[in-house]
Amino acid sequence: MATLLLIIIYFAFIGLGLPDSLFGTAWPAIYTEMGLPFSLGSAVTIIMTCGTITSSLFSSRVIAKYGTGKVTAVSTAMTALALLGFSLSGSFLPLCFLAIPLGLGAGDIDTGLNNYVALLYTSSQMSLLHCFYGIGITISPYLMSRLLATHTGWRGGYRVAFFIQLGIALLLFVTLPLWNKVAGKEAEEETPAKVLSLKELAKIPGVKNMWLLFLCSCGIESVTNNWGSTFLVEFKSMTADQAAKIMIFYFVGFTLGRLLSGILATRLSCWKIIRMGIAVMGIAMVLLLLPLPGATVAIALFLIGMGNSPLFPNFTYLTPRNFGADISQSVIGSQMAASNTGFLVAPLLCGLLGQFFGMGVLPIYLAALFVCLILGVANIQKTMKGAGKDIR
């Protein structure tokens, strides 16, 4: 029964990934059609991410009241309706309003399912969970790139994503009795959760450092996701559909990285996988910084996705091991808020810099985030080693 539930959770994470890569891929076509400056894309991203941060911080209370299954099903349905609304939007303002339910839904799904899997499943299953998120963010730009070249355009891409998301939401509602059965069985084995405030969490050694790691890793992810296509169009002189096709390399690399992390987790520790991911990203940053042709940019984007994607699930899985199962829900909620702060702040600043200095700043910006990530990993390993934790 727990295995069947895990499969359903995997489908829920496909639904979590679907909206995340759509907007960045579609934005060049949207701002061209609506006659908008490309930096306005940050406004939609900000609203969406503020919703996600808010729901992440309050998710432990919501989930405690209604249960992970119900919250996940309702949140997925909410994001499906928002995707339909995007496809019907004729101006910029509706996109901003529709970004609110997209963000709120994503925060509850992300926090609830991450803590659930971190407590009850293996590190391999955690990485595979995020691999399915990778499938979601790979499917949507692929579909969008195909539909951008047709008469349906970006609206058609959002409609297709809506139907996929709606199907996942219906699956979650139909299988709610299964969630209730498994929840009743696991409740006897779970450690009673403590709800801690941000102030209390900040006093725990290592928690603030983990916030930095999530902020930097997710900053790299969101900047590449949201501005990768614009970088290719504005700086590499590609068309919108060409850029969308190149961005598929990033999302394929992202998904492959999560898959390989799940396979390697049966033999290697989380920390070893994290160090391998950072090494792969280092190669990607060098390639991206060099003035090389478009084919090399595709390779660099692929390696950024493959190297960065294992970090989030492994950082998350380590949470109850580093800080204790009793406070893991609160810590993970704060980490999801930190990650979404990265999703919010990093692309916003990149968009503003790109508007003033050109999108050629993107490789330098990503490299700066990468350096902060390396320093953060070194520091948290030192803290955990001092606390007697195994960092091998």
Task: Enumerate the predicted regions with their spans.
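Cytoplasmic helix-loop-helix junction between adjacent transmembrane helices
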Residues: 98-132
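Helix-breaking motifs and short loop linkers at transmembrane-helix boundaries and internal kinks
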Residues: 35, 67, 88-93, 237, ...
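A late C-terminal transmembrane helix in Major Facilitator Superfamily
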Residues: 323-359
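Symmetry-related core transmembrane helices of the 12-TM Major Facilitator Superfamily/SLC fold
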Residues: 156-174, 363-379
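Conserved MFS/SLC helix-loop-helix module at the cytosolic interface between two early adjacent transmembrane helices
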Residues: 54-93
